[in-house]
């Protein structure tokens, strides 16, 4: 089981949010966003790892953010199985709205809230506050969603500074 932790420096850490995505970059960014909002944040690489984490830590996770497009076990199946383990768990599905299969996937999981990816910091904060009933308490500035800047030289012969 691969679980990534985000340490949140807070005297009174918020509820535990588990971020599950098979892609490293969005998983890392969303996990850092959750942590910077003052919530405890953990992440797992896929549905199986998330279920193992939930079984090893019963009733500790308050909210699950799961990507719909994961192989082997999509986020909807994970959400259903996670709710079987802990009915009070709040499960939220994430996906890119441009995904041509999104409507088919969502129709099978209509009972779960949805967050479009890429996730904006403001939208995530609003959604978590509303679903958890606990205001976010940002501990740091939001992580950047911008791609890393290239350090290549410009074709005009000028250097980036």
Where are these predicted regions, by residue range?
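As written
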Residues: 75, 105-115
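Short acidic/polar segment at the start of the alpha1 helix of CheY-like receiver
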Residues: 23-27
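Receiver (REC) domain active-site loop signature in two-component systems and cognate sites
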Residues: 70
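Helix N-cap/capping motif at the beta->alpha junctions
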Residues: 43-52, 75
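Hydrophobic/aromatic residues positioned on beta-strands within the core alpha/beta folds
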Residues: 94-96
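Active-site residues of response regulator receiver
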Residues: 67
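Non-catalytic signal-transmission and effector/linker regions of two-component phosphorelay proteins
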Residues: 1-18, 28-31, 55, 59-60, ...
């Amino acid at each position: 089981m691969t679980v990534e932790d985000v340490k949140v420096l807070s005297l009174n850490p918020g509820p535990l949010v588990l971020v599950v995505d098979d892609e490293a970059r969005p998983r890392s960014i969303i996990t850092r966003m959750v942590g910077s909002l003052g919530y405890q944040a953990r992440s797992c690489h896929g549905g199986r790892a998330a279920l193992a984490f939930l079984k090893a830590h019963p009733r500790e996770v308050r909210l699950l953010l799961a990507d719909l497009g994961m192989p082997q076990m999509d986020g909807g199946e994970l959400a259903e199985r996670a709710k079987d383990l802990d009915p009070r768990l709040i499960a939220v599905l994430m996906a890119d709205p441009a995904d041509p299969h999104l409507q088919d996937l969502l129709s099978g999981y209509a009972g779960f809230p949805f967050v479009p990816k890429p996730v904006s910091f403001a939208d995530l904060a609003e959604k978590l506050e509303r679903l958890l009933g606990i205001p976010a308490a940002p501990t740091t500035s939001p992580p950047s969603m911008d791609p890393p800047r290239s350090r290549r030289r410009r074709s005009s012969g000028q250097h980036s500074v």
